Amino acid sequence: MNYLTHQLLNAEEINFIEKELEQENQGWEDGKKTAGSHASIVKNNLQLKRTSDISKKLSLLIKQKILNNDLIKSFTLPKKIHGIMFTKSSKGMQYGRHIDNAYMSSGRADLSFTVFLTKKIYTRGVIY
């Protein structure tokens, strides 16, 4: 398995996204709603509803950053990007070790990624 760690967003973009996500009533729901059978056992977080206006707006920003990044394009050769999800964990929440499904509701997922908006204090998933 290959890992690519790379600064995708600049400080201004991160700040913008964080402020958007901090607004009240953004439509956060139980992350298990989109988890596969195995992942739902270890998934304990919140996820922004994909149909919300803010999710669509921020997904477009992330997608554009990925598609316009030369290093990511050379590493992945993306043909289509779909299924961008925004998740957060409060105290006591985590997303344990899991394998992403090859097929998700939005299509085949040959490659998955995590974009951290905060410093990586992530210890329970596949990022070490």
What are the residue ranges of the model-derived segments?
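Non-heme Fe(II)/2-oxoglutarate
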Residues: 1-78, 83
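Catalytic core of non-heme Fe(II) oxygenases with the double-stranded beta-helix
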Residues: 70-128
